[in-house]
């Protein structure tokens, strides 16, 4: 099976809980290589652009407000079947439905403040990685 890349966000509520290291450790324990990462504080324009597919939906403004409420950590993860394996590790989008031991079961506060984001397809991963990472900011791991 080919190595894939996926995109991950540790959202403001999880950053505020000081669990970045715990989440990274779980990524690595699950076999992911972290090949790009940075912390940033989204502007309203960045958040609206990233979540543009949800513009017009009832939750959009609240999502933008939440995602700009504090710093986030964006990362590029690499492994076989990365997109699906990462989504499995995150758990259900609604933390009320997330299985025990998933990141959302452990770190989410609500449906909107669900602690983490993960790409839902390879196409989304490519688009989302390009949104936050420029040329040379993702470093393939060779060891």
Curated annotation (Swiss-Prot):
Gene3D superfamilies: Nucleoside diphosphate kinase-like domain (3.30.70.141). GO terms for molecular function: ATP binding; metal ion binding; nucleoside diphosphate kinase activity. InterPro entries: NDK-like_dom, NDK-like_dom_sf, Nucleoside_diP_kinase, Nucleoside_diP_kinase_AS. SUPFAM superfamilies: Nucleoside diphosphate kinase, NDK. Keywords: ATP-binding, Cytoplasm, Kinase, Magnesium, Metal-binding, Nucleotide metabolism, Nucleotide-binding, Phosphoprotein, Transferase. The keyword Iron does not apply. ATP binds at residues 11, 59, 87, 93, 104, 114. Its EC number is 2.7.4.6. It is an enzyme of class 2 (transferase). The keyword Cell wall biogenesis/degradation does not apply. Homotetramer. Major role in the synthesis of nucleoside triphosphates other than ATP. The ATP gamma phosphate is transferred to the NDP beta phosphate via a ping-pong mechanism, using a phosphorylated active-site intermediate. This is Nucleoside diphosphate kinase.
């Amino acid at each position: 099976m080919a190595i894939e890349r996926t995109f991950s966000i540790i959202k403001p509520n999880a950053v505020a809980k000081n669990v970045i290291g715990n989440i990274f450790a779980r990524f690595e324990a699950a076999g992911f290589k972290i090949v790009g990462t940075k912390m940033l504080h989204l502007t309203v324009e960045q958040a609206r652009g990233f979540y543009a597919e949800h513009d017009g939906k009832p939750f959009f403004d609240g999502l933008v407000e939440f995602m700009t409420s504090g710093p986030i950590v964006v990362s590029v993860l690499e492994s076989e079947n990365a997109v699906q394996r990462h989504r499995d590790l995150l758990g259900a989008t609604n933390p009320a439905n997330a299985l025990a031991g998933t990141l959302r079961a452990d770190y989410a506060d609500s449906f909107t403040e669900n602690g983490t984001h993960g790409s839902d397809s390879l196409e989304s991963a490519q688009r989302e990685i390009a949104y936050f990472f420029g040329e040379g900011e993702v470093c393939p791991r060779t060891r």
